[in-house]
Amino acid sequence: MNSMKYRDLRDFLTLLEHKGELKRISFEVDPYLEMTEIADRTLRAGGPALLFENPKGYSMPVLCNLFGTAERVAMGMGQKDVKALHDVGKLLAFLKEPDPPKGFRDLLDKLPKFKQVLNMPTKRLNTAPCQEHVSVGDDVDLTRIPIMHCWPEDAAPLITWGLTVTRGPNKERQNLGIYRQQVLGKNKLIMRWLSHRGGALDFQEWCQAHPGERFPVAVALGADPATILGAVTPIPDTLSEYAFAGLLRGYKTEVVKCLSNNLEVPASAEIVLEGYIEPGELAPEGPYGDHTGYYNEIDMFPVFTVTHITQRHDAIYHSTYTGRPPDEPAVLGVALNEVLVPILQKQFPEIVDFYLPPEGCSYRLAVVTMKKQYPGHAKRVMMGVWSYLRQFMYTKFVIVCDDDINARDWNDVIWAITTRMDPVRDTVLMENTPIDYLDFASPVSGLGSKMGMDATNKWLGETQREWGRPIVMSEEVRTRVDKIWDELDILGP
């Protein structure tokens, strides 16, 4: 893997600007709806990251569309192109289940990976850029930050790219997660985390171990790209997001202790919110336009009280919006798809490709191609996808095809479904499984069904009929026509 040349978000923006991948907008633009519309049009056109230098009513610039193309996601991970993200996936697969060296030569081959692991511990600083300016007590005022109000029916401005830092009572390592946060007032936010996410689990364990005590929380905004992407990558449970960021970056992640608690935050973050969650303090969150393309339901979530705001001089507020794909989460999903393939292949070597179509809201539908080896094999792979990584807990549909099908070509996939499937025999239905809270199509919030589709050629034991043979032109004729094709001049120049 390549080492990055940027230590913080500003270094990355300098690189993007040099490559023509950042557009500075000096025109006055309103964080209320206007930024969303501009960012959405830009993303759909494959355009650059946007730095709104003159937000209406604010002096702090707003960064949007940072990871609006898969290529910029790859750059953020220190890779030259999207395909190189396979290397990131191979490293994660190795860390998830490391293979012992089989001999001296194999040890030499594995040395680069072991060397990268040395960059995993964090580097703790006594002073840091993220604490150059400090607001405490009555000076804490979230309304001074140009937090975007993304859609007309949204309940309030919404923080979208905050890295929430928590630690459970019995854990050495911290958890970094990205959870949206509704603004309630000048020092109050609603922390919308689902019950299975790391931050929520830390909070549950804290409440059991320290009933009635305040739970420390920090939220970092505008961290370096390796740390941001580390928070959205399917890393092993035993590996911290800071450690993974160190692997990506090629050197240790620099952190600093919060002023009000013992949590450690990215030293180069643009803004850090410190505070606590009071057990039992809840508030109705939503509705908000989400990555599904719909407004979600209102539900109760914990309230995060902000006691300190620390920030860099001339801080930049990093933001995004979510909406019907494509949006920034969908683009991230396309890029991270390349990371997932080697991780799955480590556990299931028969898998040839794995694809999460962005129009399927990034994770709700998966297409798998495989080298089938025995009757019922496709169903085993379905179950494996649903159970191996918790990222696929909410995947509603899994389609399994043979390796002669291109998982990323709907023409191929639909042909396989319509010619190789019997709806009753080849469909697996499961009820009462975990489903995304945002999926209003499920009969009960958080609980719904899943469908697996076996679109592979059927083997003896799976069918009693003679199976069809695909039509393929003879290689001799194809070669002959290749030679005379230009002379035929059928399609013109």
UniProtKB/Swiss-Prot annotation:
Pfam families noted in UniProt: UbiD, UbiD_C, UbiD_N
Record note on cofactor: Binds 1 prenylated FMN per subunit.
Membrane topology classification: Peripheral membrane protein
Active-site residues (renumbered): D290 (proton donor)
GO biological process, alphabetically ordered: ubiquinone biosynthetic process
EC numbers on record: 4.1.1.98
Catalytic activity field: a 4-hydroxy-3-(all-trans-polyprenyl)benzoate + H(+) = a 2-(all-trans-polyprenyl)phenol + CO2
Predominant cellular place of this UniProt entry's protein: membrane
Binding site for prenylated FMN: I178, Y179, R180, R192, W193, L194, R197, G198
Pathway the protein acts in: Cofactor biosynthesis; ubiquinone biosynthesis
Any single GO CC term annotated in Swiss-Prot or TrEMBL for this entry: cytosol
One function term, GO molecular function aspect: metal ion binding
Residues the record lists as binding Mn(2+): N175, E241
Cellular localization per UniProt: Cell membrane
Co-factor requirement: prenylated FMN; Mn(2+)
Protein keywords: Cell membrane, Decarboxylase, Flavoprotein, FMN, Lyase, Manganese, Membrane, Metal-binding, Ubiquinone biosynthesis
Origin superkingdom: Bacteria
Entry-linked NCBIfam families: PRK10922.1, UbiD family decarboxylase
Record's subunit section: Homohexamer.
HAMAP family xrefs: UbiD (MF_01636)
Function recorded in the entry: Catalyzes the decarboxylation of 3-octaprenyl-4-hydroxy benzoate to 2-octaprenylphenol, an intermediate step in ubiquinone biosynthesis.
Similarity section: Belongs to the UbiD family.
Name the UniProt record assigns to this protein: 3-octaprenyl-4-hydroxybenzoate carboxy-lyase
Originating organism: Photorhabdus laumondii subsp. laumondii (strain DSM 15139 / CIP 105565 / TT01)
Record gene name: ubiD
